C-alpha cells in the first residue's frame, strides 16, 4: 500500500526477513463451491470472472485499510492492523465482510443479465456466494520466506482460527462467521453492526470452546423482518441452551420464515442458521 511505502521511505529501512508479534484481525474469504466454476467455465471465462470478482472485493479491502496477504485461487487472505497499526482493526474487518457481501449482491445482479457472456454457466455465475471468517488476536507478522524472495504475511494460532471461521460457517448456514474476540473488539470501536450468536465450538488443536457470531449487517440497513428474525433466533438459542427443545423449535421455526437468506429465494443459498438449528433440535429430541 502507499501508506506502507511512505513508512518505509521515512524510516529508511530495507525490507528484511523477520517477524514480530502484533495485535491484528485476520480475514479469510472463499467462494462457495468454487470447484464447480473451475469445471464448467472455460479457462478464459474463469479468469475473466475471477478478475472481476477479485478486483471488486480487493477495492473494498483497500478502501477499508486492509492489507492483502495473498490470493489463493478464489480465496482472499488479508489482515487488519499490520503493517500500519490500527486501533479499529476488528471493526474494519467486519465492516469489510458486510460491504463485500453487499457488493456481491450487485455483481450477481449484473451477471444475471450477461447470459450471452457466461453461456451454460450463466445460472452458476449469477448464484455465486462467498463465505468470510475473521478472528482477532496476537499473531506473528513480517517478511517470511527465502533470503532473496519473501512475502509480508501472518502466522499463528489466531490466524488458523480465522480460517476455521470461514470454513466452519457452512455448517451454520452463515456467510460471515467471526469469533467473540472480533465481535467485542468491533463493538468497542463502534456499535452499529447487528450480530447473532451461533454456537460455541471446540476447534481442533484447542481445548477451550470459542463462541461464534454472525454479523448480519449494519443496524441502519436492517428491515423489520430481519430484526424480528434475530429476536426470534435469540429466544430460540436461549431455550436451546436450556435444553427446551420444543420451545427452541417453535422460535427457530418463526425465525426461519423471516430469515434474510432463504433457499429458492436468495441465489445460491441452500440453508440458513434457523434451518440448521431446527435440524439440531430435532436430533436432540430424538436422542436425549
Task: Name every feature range the model reports, one short phrase each.
Residues 5, 34, 182-183:
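A generic structural signal for short hydrophobic patches within well-formed alpha-helices
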Residues 60-92, 106-157, 181, 187, ...:
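Catalytic core of nucleotidyl cyclases, primarily class III adenylyl/guanylyl cyclases
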Residues 129, 139, 168-238, 242-247, ...:
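Cytosolic regulatory/linker segments at or just downstream of nucleotide-handling modules
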Residues 13-96, 149-152:
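Catalytic NTP-binding/metal-coordinating core of nucleotidyl cyclase/transferase enzymes
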Residues 1-21, 105, 110, 267-268:
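Regulatory cytosolic signal-relay segments
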Residues 100:
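Serine endopeptidase catalytic core focused on the charge-relay Asp
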Amino acid at each position: 500500500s502507499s501508506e506502507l511505502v511512505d513508512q518505509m521511505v521515512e524510516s529508511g529501512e530495507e525490507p528484511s526477513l523477520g517477524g514480530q508479534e502484533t495485535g491484528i484481525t485476520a480475514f479469510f474469504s472463499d467462494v462457495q463451491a468454487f470447484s464447480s466454476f473451475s469445471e464448467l467455465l472455460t479457462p478464459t471465462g474463469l479468469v475473466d470472472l475471477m478478475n472481476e470478482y477479485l478486483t471488486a472485493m480487493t477495492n473494498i479491502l483497500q478502501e477499508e485499510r486492509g492489507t492483502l496477504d495473498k490470493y489463493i485461487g478464489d480465496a482472499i487472505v488479508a489482515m487488519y492492523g499490520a503493517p500500519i497499526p490500527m486501533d479499529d482493526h476488528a471493526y474494519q474487518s467486519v465492516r469489510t465482510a458486510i460491504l463485500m457481501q453487499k457488493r456481491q449482491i450487485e455483481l450477481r445482479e449484473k451477471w444475471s443479465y450477461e447470459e450471452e457472456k457466461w453461456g451454460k454457466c450463466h445460472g452458476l455465475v449469477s448464484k455465486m456466494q462467498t463465505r468470510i471468517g475473521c478472528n482477532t488476536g496476537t499473531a506473528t507478522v513480517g517478511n517470511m520466506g527465502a533470503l532473496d524472495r519473501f512475502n509480508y504475511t501472518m502466522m499463528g494460532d489466531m490466524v488458523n482460527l480465522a480460517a476455521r471461521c470461514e470454513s466452519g460457517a457452512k455448517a451454520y448456514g452463515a456467510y460471515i462467521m467471526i469469533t467473540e474476540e472480533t465481535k467485542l473488539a468491533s463493538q468497542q470501536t463502534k456499535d452499529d453492526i447487528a450480530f447473532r450468536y451461533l454456537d460455541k465450538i471446540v476447534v481442533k488443536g484447542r481445548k477451550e470452546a470459542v463462541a461464534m457470531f454472525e454479523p448480519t449487517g449494519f443496524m441502519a440497513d436492517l428491515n423489520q423482518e430481519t430484526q424480528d428474525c434475530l429476536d426470534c433466533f435469540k429466544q430460540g438459542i436461549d431455550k436451546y441452551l436450556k435444553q427446551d427443545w420444543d420451545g427452541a423449535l417453535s422460535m427457530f421455526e418463526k425465525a426461519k420464515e423471516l430469515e434474510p437468506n432463504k433457499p429458492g429465494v436468495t441465489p445460491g443459498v441452500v440453508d440458513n442458521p434457523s434451518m440448521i438449528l431446527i435440524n439440531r433440535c430435532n436430533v436432540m429430541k430424538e436422542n436425549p
